[in-house]
Amino acid sequence: MKKHLIVAGVPRAGKSTLCAQIARNFPYQHISMDSVIAGFERCFPDTGVSTYQGLSSMDTLKVISHKMAPFLQAMIDSGEYDEQDYGMLIDMYQLLPEDYVNQIDPERCAILYLVTGNVTPEERFLIQKQYDTPKDYTYYKTDEELKEGAQYIVEQSRLIREQCERHGLPCFETAFDRGQVLEGILQKLSM
């Protein structure tokens, strides 16, 4: 296993659930990049790392991904984990495969993606409702907002899957049999 691992993909695909399981079973420290990005938005708005840029959801994803990839590489390069028995387990939505390939050292940091693109937006909306909890920011959104979000999550899932295929990166569909898919990933990591 690599010193560091990124679990990336769309919201409610199982990233945080998988990261919690990985952190319990392997020598990794779970880092949620949602919190880091929220910090950038609030304290350093001049960086352009913001989910509220007035852009389409797809364009916002691309902008944040392109800006966060070198930040992640700087975290890896810092050497803070080199002397530890554990590495970083980075849980992240806004990192496209093309930015991982172009800006992050794969010798030191592996990646896998979780998506929900083999569904219609309506099916994706129902998945969101199934897995939302009061701890999730989406839990408090209206059904209308969630249905709009489901459309872009399906589109982003398909973009991520296409880029993963192009670059030979692991991508897992979690729209159906999510628990089994996540368990299969854990088994692969154990080998």
Residue ranges of predicted features:
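A glycine- and Lys/Arg-enriched "phosphate-lid" helix/loop adjacent to the NTP-binding pocket
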Residues: 110-156
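Conserved substrate/cofactor phosphate-moiety recognition/catalytic segment
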Residues: 20, 24-67
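Glycine-rich phosphate-binding loop used to anchor ATP phosphates in small-molecule kinases
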Residues: 59-108, 112-116
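The conserved Walker
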Residues: 11
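Conserved glycine(s) of the Walker
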Residues: 14
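NTP-dependent small-molecule kinase module
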Residues: 155-191
